[in-house]
Structures are given as structure tokens and as C-alpha cells.
Amino acid sequence: TGLSYYLKYAEDSTEDDPTIIAKGVDENGNEFEKTIHINEINPKSATVVEMRALEAHMGVKKLGGFTSLPMEAGAMGLNDRTDFMDMFQKQIGDMKLLLQKKTAAYYQYSMQAYWDFMNKK
């Protein structure tokens, strides 16, 4: 059925080193557990699980209650890495082409939140 997991803060997570545990089943039905250090995430080369952990930590508003990430991210596997900033640009362009101004503005907001995160590093 695809990638399925939950996120929780690690017991040793701190304000200076926020750490999240992702635990679940990958797209092949194999169980996994990953430790994600938020400060080490690079949205220009990240997995979907890393970005969902970053999204949760930052409290980015979710479109329709699901995710702030572009729709294409839903097709990614556990270890697939991509440039989410490029993915956002493509999604914004697609939404503008379809005259979906509110959706385009939402993805612009989301992308800006992740740019701000990268610029704080």
C-alpha cells in the first residue's frame, strides 16, 4: 500500500538538536525506524520522511489537512531523495497554469517556510 509511518520526538531531542524518530513500513512492506536530526535536513536533497519530520517540527500549515509538500512527494519511496525546492517550483507553475491561484499561493507559502529554514542554517 506504500510508505506508512508515524513521527515522534526522540527522548534525547533538545531545542538545539531537535530529533525525530520515524517508524513504520516502507513501500516494499519492510519495517523501518529512522532517527532524523532536524538541523541536518537539506530540503534541496531530502527524503519525503525527512521533509514530513521538518514540516511537523516547523508547524507548517497543511493544505486540506494532509501535507504542505507537493503532490508528487506522495509517490516517493523511503530512501528516495529529491530537491523539494525544485518540486515546489514545478507545483506552483502547474497550479498557475491551471489557474489555481489559491493553491499556487499556498505552495508559495510552504516553499518560503522551507527557504527560511535553510537560510537560518
Please give the residue ranges for each predicted region.
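Type III/flagellar secretion export determinants
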Residues: 1-121
